[in-house]
Amino acid sequence: MYLVAGDRGLAGCGHLLVSLLGLLLLLARSGTRALVCLPCDESKCEEPRNCPGSIVQGVCGCCYTCASQRNESCGGTFGIYGTCDRGLRCVIRPPLNGDSLTEYEAGVCEDENWTDDQLLGFKPCNENLIAGCNIINGKCECNTIRTCSNPFEFPSQDMCLSALKRIEEEKPDCSKARCEVQFSPRCPEDSVLIEGYAPPGECCPLPSRCVCNPAGCLRKVCQPGNLNILVSKASGKPGECCDLYECKPVFGVDCRTVECPPVQQTACPPDSYETQVRLTADGCCTLPTRCECLSGLCGFPVCEVGSTPRIVSRGDGTPGKCCDVFECVNDTKPACVFNNVEYYDGDMFRMDNCRFCRCQGGVAICFTAQCGEINCERYYVPEGECCPVCEDPVYPFNNPAGCYANGLILAHGDRWREDDCTFCQCVNGERHCVATVCGQTCTNPVKVPGECCPVCEEPTIITVDPPACGELSNCTLTGKDCINGFKRDHNGCRTCQCINTEELCSERKQGCTLNCPFGFLTDAQNCEICECRPRPKKCRPIICDKYCPLGLLKNKHGCDICRCKKCPELSCSKICPLGFQQDSHGCLICKCREASASAGPPILSGTCLTVDGHHHKNEESWHDGCRECYCLNGREMCALITCPVPACGNPTIHPGQCCPSCADDFVVQKPELSTPSICHAPGGEYFVEGETWNIDSCTQCTCHSGRVLCETEVCPPLLCQNPSRTQDSCCPQCTDQPFRPSLSRNNSVPNYCKNDEGDIFLAAESWKPDVCTSCICIDSVISCFSESCPSVSCERPVLRKGQCCPYCIEDTIPKKVVCHFSGKAYADEERWDLDSCTHCYCLQGQTLCSTVSCPPLPCVEPINVEGSCCPMCPEMYVPEPTNIPIEKTNHRGEVDLEVPLWPTPSENDIVHLPRDMGHLQVDYRDNRLHPSEDSSLDSIASVVVPIIICLSIIIAFLFINQKKQWIPLLCWYRTPTKPSSLNNQLVSVDCKKGTRVQVDSSQRMLRIAEPDARFSGFYSMQKQNHLQADNFYQTV
């Protein structure tokens, strides 16, 4: 029994020992799967050196190690054998005996052979140790970090300290600055907070912002048999800074459980081939194949004699259209017909002065000549030419000798063409020649025989994506150091090198064909330009004792004469089609003459705060992503862009876009800049560098670097659904009852709102999150209203910065036209005189002139009066009133000052008549004659003499005006106290009709007479500014 009992006890102990041994083995096995990591101490980490690729974190996520390269080991438990570099994958092959994969096998790094859709533009990032410094809170903070891109502004501490010293010297006075309170946003895990700081030269800090932190992007560590697959690409915005990966199994999947999608058989065209079959990531299914063009297939056909190849369709390099398709046709060339003249294939002909055509396959392909910019005050377009040329100022005709050119003798003022590009003018016996200025807007201009300026056979508007130029880092040069600008690389980006004078001037004379015996003229930068220097003047020394502050006058040869200048020399580079304005002394000033200038808003000064919330210094230029902008005296001036009007009722401007679009409209509308010119305003006017004007009552524009930049009024938020804009308002207004907020008295509700970006708004505060939306904070809830855009009738509506809806600028700008006559430009409705007999008028671009015809005179010996067109009889001539002393020389050669007998009367002046008119003394007051109180005339003389004089005057006028209407004497009885006159000529009024005034001239001019309520039977003279007022169409 005991034995049995003892056997049973031993058996129980044996079972217990076996159980304990199995538990220990299980713990031992499980211990091999555990990963024990000590607390991270980066000071004990060794920096990996000479890594052939990038670096990755170790298994414990503390220290860095070199990433495994192609054909190196990887995988294992927790990736203990290594992690493959970017662009490689860890491939673990199944065992040869058919067993399933475990997590202990080691893999090999191989290339990733995924499709483009699976990779999503996956690119490796080579992280390196980068050292540098940044200015933070007025101090230089330096550090050394491992990153992909350089986050430092200065590469060394010395450069940072020198920049900090320069900033301290230019630091503004911030004692009175008022800065807005900036709230710091809460950043996602993949980004870091950049605290707002005050830029150099500014007092207020910029808002704090979140920026992506590449070091915070971690890739998942997948178990063996799985691979990191890129699912979505990072967008660069906080919250989307990192690429998103998922772990997917690799070749360890049982394909029997995988259902593959059907793959259609690809049939490729004859000009292409089918690519090889590829497998999916799990190795179970095949991917669709695609067609690619065959290499070396395209060629030029060889046609038989008598036929030539002609292209049928152009190839674009895609399967089915890999090559151009030709056909052989007969040699009979189709012709182009223009003005009943046939032109064959390849022939060029001229449609008008500026358009040339080439006949191609029976179709006329026309192009426009390319004219360049001219920098002169006076210019003209030669007859039969397109591009203007500069013209010398008009000199008085002093030399009767002409110019000898091309075997002909030409007179003063004559112009002729020397060659294709040179035009000359005869000025006082000397030939002055200038060259045509040509422009170039295409890469391959074509020279037309017999023409100066080339033409572009490709479209004249070339759309080129601007190069993505980064900031000019590690460069201590400033704009003051490089007065001629910075050099640019092949991508058009600035480099840290200045343009010297030789490089700047080399382009000024490029293509110049003038042969100038006395050299070339120079511009403001002392660079030679394509214009000849005139013959040097040989002047004799003069002796002049006059003191002339403004210098002496010059004769036609450019030599000084002993006469003083009354006006200073005009040094101005502006191009003014209407000429320059004059000051009170009649001297020209550097300001263009305008027909009418509307008063604009006052010009501010200082820095600009843009609509986007950025600060810019005065005269600073920048590009806001959509348009070119410029800071002018505190105003943000931006170029107008052309945008289509959205069709929906609640448009918005999406991030990264420039034009308003609808929510479901995914087509990015690229804005077009308004047609660039040499500051050619939308209204048709020309402006020069630095000039400002108003295109309407709401928009002020300026000319900067050859582009029209405009600023507009910033509009407040609109708290209604359907705002509208009237012609007399600059901003849209709420036509219906606007939303009026009422403050809540519920203390349990917070008195602020918070949007999705973390911005905080107070109760009843309104704002515009974008230019098309207005919001308001009520009871901690944000309510928003969208603006809808009305339809427009123009082809190219423009969009001002800061506004939502495009509009037609043609509706607000009156079209102004200019008349060109004798080399001068005149504004619309402007008048001028060619001489005393010919008067001209500009009407809508047409020049209309009228000539006065002189009537026969009853006298035998008429006289010519200076300033008058027609001669007149001596008894009709009455000298005009004057009180200017006249110089007369007596018989001894002395100069006497003599005042005329008819002084200009002023108030309370007494006029003494000559002796031959009797002893009549009158007092001139209130513009009327009054008998003097101390007159000694007797009663008979005071009555008879005036009657005789009046009857003589009346008989003389009735005889002269016998063809005119008789003047009823009763009409003169109602003449007002102020006499009516026109151009110092006698005015006769028809009292019965009251609407026509006849001037004593052979060409009678019609005037409109309107009743004046102050005087009974009197009509005031109202000058009308149109052709019917001056009778340019007919004479009576």
Curated annotation (Swiss-Prot):
IGFBP N-terminal domain location: 35-112
Gene3D superfamilies noted in UniProt: 4.10.40.20, 6.20.200.20, Antistasin, domain 1 (2.10.22.10)
Keyword set, alphabetical order: Cell membrane, Disulfide bond, Glycoprotein, Membrane, Phosphoprotein, Repeat, Secreted, Signal, Transmembrane, Transmembrane helix
Membrane topology: Single-pass type I membrane protein
Tissue: Expressed in pancreas, kidney, skeletal muscle, lung, placenta, brain, heart, spleen, liver and small intestine. Expressed in blood vessels (at protein level).
PTMs per UniProt: N-glycosylated.
Signal sequence region: 1-34
Glycosylation sites: N71, N113, N330, N474, N746
Domain (Antistasin-like) ranges: 469-498, 505-532, 539-564, 567-592
Modified residues (Phosphothreonine): T1035
Assembly description: Interacts with BMP4 and BMP7.
Stated role: May play a role in CNS development by interacting with growth factors implicated in motor neuron differentiation and survival. May play a role in capillary formation and maintenance during angiogenesis. Modulates BMP activity by affecting its processing and delivery to the cell surface.
Name of the featured protein: Cysteine-rich motor neuron 1 protein
